């Protein structure tokens, strides 16, 4: 059978190579199959390199195959991203999954997933209560989880890892999940020997700085960025009617009105995101909607 890795590899770096080598040592007879995002990432941004370029580096690191996650999976919130990716593992007969985790407690993830499955109605009621208070889905979900099981999962990789395990448990998939302790925090600007977070490396890449200590990837030019398309986005929002904007995927509860107003005030991409996000709407959701508007992705 095979071990699956679900990833963006944005960029592919030494921490990812460490995980691949760990899997080779722990499961020497298993194929390693990677399921990787394409051009666009979960936060609605453009990956620093094309799917094919990243795939080349990943194959050179010793994995067996690399498959592309569909757009409708790779540009979604954690729970939808996880459901789509895990379903793909199941369809490709992958029977093991390994993911990075800050907590590194797979038994805890399974305990929480099973508790949620057995108390789904109670969890959904608590979730609705917190959503009614004006909280965004990630915060409401975290608080509903804490009130039900006594644990609050707050770190990015733990949140995604729990969603993977929930997708496995809820669908009774024959997939065993494992986790590996992360060496660097998700958004950390600190480095550790030859390791650095993908977030920090992207900052260096966009400044044309050398990342060879932390990644095998070579960048001869500055990659394209979603920020470069703000003017196009702005004109689309201005020229599109509220009724048509409301048809864009993820737009709900009058967000089209909010976008119409803010786009006249915000001078650039970051300014728009900062003005548009709120307790209810995370920056990541705003960025995904901005991408969907640019690409005209309807509900």
UniProtKB/Swiss-Prot annotation:
UniProt keyword annotation of RNA-binding present: yes
Compartmental location: Cytoplasm
GO MF annotation: an example: tRNA binding
EC number, UniProt record: 6.3.4.-
Assigned GO CC terms: cytoplasm
Region forming the signal peptide: none
Lineage top rank: taxon: Bacteria
Keyword line: ATP-binding, Cytoplasm, Ligase, Nucleotide-binding, RNA-binding, tRNA processing, tRNA-binding
Residue numbers binding ATP: 6-19, 100, 157, 182
GO biological process terms on file: tRNA modification
Catalyzed chemical reaction(s): cytidine(34) in elongator tRNA(Met) + acetate + ATP = N(4)-acetylcytidine(34) in elongator tRNA(Met) + AMP + diphosphate
SUPFAM superfamilies, sorted: Nucleotidylyl transferase
Function summary: Catalyzes the formation of N(4)-acetylcytidine (ac(4)C) at the wobble position of elongator tRNA(Met), using acetate and ATP as substrates. First activates an acetate ion to form acetyladenylate (Ac-AMP) and then transfers the acetyl group to tRNA to form ac(4)C34.
HAMAP family found in the cross-reference section: TmcAL
NCBIfam families in the record: PRK13671.1
Similarity comment: Belongs to the TmcAL family.
Protein name per Swiss-Prot or TrEMBL: tRNA(Met) cytidine acetate ligase
Annotated source species: Mycoplasma mobile (strain ATCC 43663 / 163K / NCTC 11711) (Mesomycoplasma mobile)
Source organism phylogeny: Bacteria, Bacillati, Mycoplasmatota, Mycoplasmoidales, Metamycoplasmataceae
């Amino acid at each position: 059978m095979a071990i699956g890795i679900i990833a963006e590899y944005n960029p592919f770096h030494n921490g990812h190579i460490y995980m691949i080598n760990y899997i080779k040592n722990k499961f020497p007879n298993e194929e390693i199959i990677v399921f990787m995002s394409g051009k666009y990432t979960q936060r609605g941004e453009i990956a620093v390199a094309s799917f094919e370029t990243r795939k080349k580096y990943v194959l050179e690191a010793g994995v067996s195959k690399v498959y592309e996650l569909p757009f409708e999976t790779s540009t979604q919130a954690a729970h939808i991203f996880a459901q789509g990716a895990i379903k793909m593992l199941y369809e490709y007969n992958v029977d093991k999954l390994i993911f990075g985790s800050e907590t590194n407690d797979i038994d805890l993830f399974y305990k929480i997933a099973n508790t949620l499955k057995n108390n789904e109605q109670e969890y959904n009621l608590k979730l609705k209560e917190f959503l009614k208070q004006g909280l965004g889905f990630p915060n409401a979900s975290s608080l509903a989880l804490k009130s039900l099981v006594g644990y609050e999962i707050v770190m990015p990789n733990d949140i995604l890892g729990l969603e993977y395990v929930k997708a496995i448990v809820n669908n009774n998939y024959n997939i065993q999940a494992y986790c590996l302790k992360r060496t660097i925090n998700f958004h950390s600007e600190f480095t550790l020997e030859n390791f650095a977070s993908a977030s920090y490396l992207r900052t260096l890449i966009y400044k044309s700085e050398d990342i060879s200590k932390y990644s095998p990837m070579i960048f001869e030019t500055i990659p394209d960025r979603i920020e470069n398309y703000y003017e196009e986005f702005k004109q689309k929002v201005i020229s599109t009617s509220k009724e048509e904007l409301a048809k864009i995927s993820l737009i709900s509860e009058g967000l089209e009105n909010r976008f119409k107003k803010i786009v006249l005030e915000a001078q650039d991409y970051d300014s728009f995101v900062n003005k548009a996000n709120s307790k209810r709407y995370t920056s990541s959701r705003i960025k995904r909607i901005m991408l969907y508007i640019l690409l005209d992705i309807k509900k």
